[in-house]
């Protein structure tokens, strides 16, 4: 095979740094886990729950998130989520995943910290043993949470560093509470060996017309992150683009998610190619693939159609990954052994994708 031969999108190795593990759970699995845990849902069939998965706004997404994540209560639930996603992602070429999970909400509903962390870590170990996919974990709090609970999350993350927890983050409504209110909670992260990987800059414009660049800038100044999940609001602010580039911050971008939540109106206008052209390392991820009906092949295809080559995404993934040097070396070897497509003309796919 030469770089000019057609290359299957599924065959190209992929690194995913932005996926919420709770958002990978498909409707049938939600119903199964709810039944296993003796929990009642407002719907009883896969079709009824699938209808709720068709979100068109961020508010729709948050309502669904609360409904579906509340069924996860036991270590076996959390472990199953990781293993199931690793199996599906492998079919799309995933070789390394940094999965996000949200322990604070579960703790507030009576689930123990250890139950959550043990379950997800066991799932990461099983994902590699059963499917050969390296999974690392980044627990995440939400803006609006009690800062002391967030600090406790960071402390627990440090205790599980040797089981694959590599970073910590914060997400949710960017204007619910200023990120600086959580600066003290995240301050110990570096000494614990953890990278800080918050969500910010998801919306270039908020519904009231305010710029998303302001909350992105505030998050960068408050937390000094190594990566930003989303970050597309930076594209409208050249000074902020310069800050991100100079600090070496990697952006974990999710095109389909941005379309589904209304962050952008048209994939053809997505800022990913502008950010990449500005010298910012960008990865693409699925965010919440079960909710947004997407997968890694689809996201890489969208990026390719926007002019961002898969090798560039893969190399940015290595740059941003919080794994140890041995794993990074392994990922570089995979990249070096791959025949990468050099133009979108050689990028063949059977994956579903939005027209651009």
Swiss-Prot record:
What detail does the entry give on cofactor binding?
Binds 1 zinc ion per subunit.
Pfam families per the UniProt record, alphabetical: A_deaminase
Q: What is this protein called?
A: Aminodeoxyfutalosine deaminase
Reaction equations catalysed? 6-amino-6-deoxyfutalosine + H2O + H(+) = futalosine + NH4(+)
Keywords attached to this Swiss-Prot or TrEMBL record, sorted alphabetically, are: Hydrolase, Menaquinone biosynthesis, Metal-binding, Zinc
Where on this chain does Zn(2+) bind? Answer: 18, 20, 199, 287
| Catalytic-site annotation from UniProt | 202
Instruction: Enumerate the residues binding substrate.
Output: 73, 140, 172
In short, the EC number is 3.5.4.40
Q: Does the keyword Ribosomal protein apply?
A: no
Task of the protein: Catalyzes the deamination of aminodeoxyfutalosine (AFL) into futalosine (FL), a step in the biosynthesis of menaquinone (MK, vitamin K2). Is very poorly efficient on 1-(6-amino-9H-purin-9-yl)-1-deoxy-N-ethyl-beta-D-ribofuranuronamide (NECA), adenosine, 5'-methylthioadenosine, 5'-deoxyadenosine, 2'-deoxyadenosine, and AMP as substrate.
Q: What Gene Ontology biological process does one annotation of this record name?
A: menaquinone biosynthetic process
> Which family does the record claim for this protein?
Belongs to the metallo-dependent hydrolases superfamily. Adenosine and AMP deaminases family.
For molecular function, the Gene Ontology terms on record are:
deaminase activity; hydrolase activity, acting on carbon-nitrogen (but not peptide) bonds, in cyclic amidines; metal ion binding
Looking at the keywords, is Metal-binding present? yes
Which cofactors does this protein require?
A: Zn(2+)
Q: Which organism is it from?
A: Acidothermus cellulolyticus (strain ATCC 43068 / DSM 8971 / 11B)
Cited InterPro entries:
A_deaminase_dom (IPR001365), Ado/ade_deaminase (IPR006330), Metal_Hydrolase (IPR032466)
Q: Which pathway does it operate in?
A: Quinol/quinone metabolism; menaquinone biosynthesis
